[in-house]
């Protein structure tokens, strides 16, 4: 491994290779060449090869996403405002993600699987880890977990199948959409 070469540089190279050739076609050799490391170095850093490397890339992307999301929501002191901020920011981040757009265009089946069936449990786990401290002041632990699960599924669903009438990237539209659900939750907690 050359001076300054790191796991991050290899993950960056993997991301570029995926954008260029698609997940199914990219090889360890492609990633090693793009990152300037040998196959041996790549395997030493990512034992298990391509699957382990792609898993590390997904974890990094999720971590960066939720770092940005929690930074945007920091300081919000009202539950409704928090939910709106989380939904709007997440929707805007997903829409602005060029890598995601490229991958959806070139390998929609693979990406849909990672956003839904295969990758959704991981996304919900990471979301719960990051968002619970923000949501917990307003809800019980169990309610927080369920609310985060719902928010993740809702946001991904509307990202993948946008509505003609609801824009979750718009604060006013998102607020109008979630208010009835939050009102029902508040009533259920009172009774």
Locate the predicted segments by residue.
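Basic, helix-initiating cap at the start of DNA-binding domains
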Residues: 1-21, 25-34
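Short hydrophobic clusters on alpha-helical segments that form packing/core surfaces
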Residues: 10-18, 61, 65, 90
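Key DNA-contact positions within bacterial/archaeal DNA-binding proteins
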Residues: 40
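Hydrophobic alpha-helical connector segments
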Residues: 56, 70-96, 148
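Amphipathic alpha-helical packing segments from all-alpha helical-bundle domains
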Residues: 66, 111-149
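Amphipathic alpha-helical segments used for helix-helix packing
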Residues: 85, 91-120
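Amphipathic C-terminal alpha-helical segment
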Residues: 92-96, 151-168, 181-190
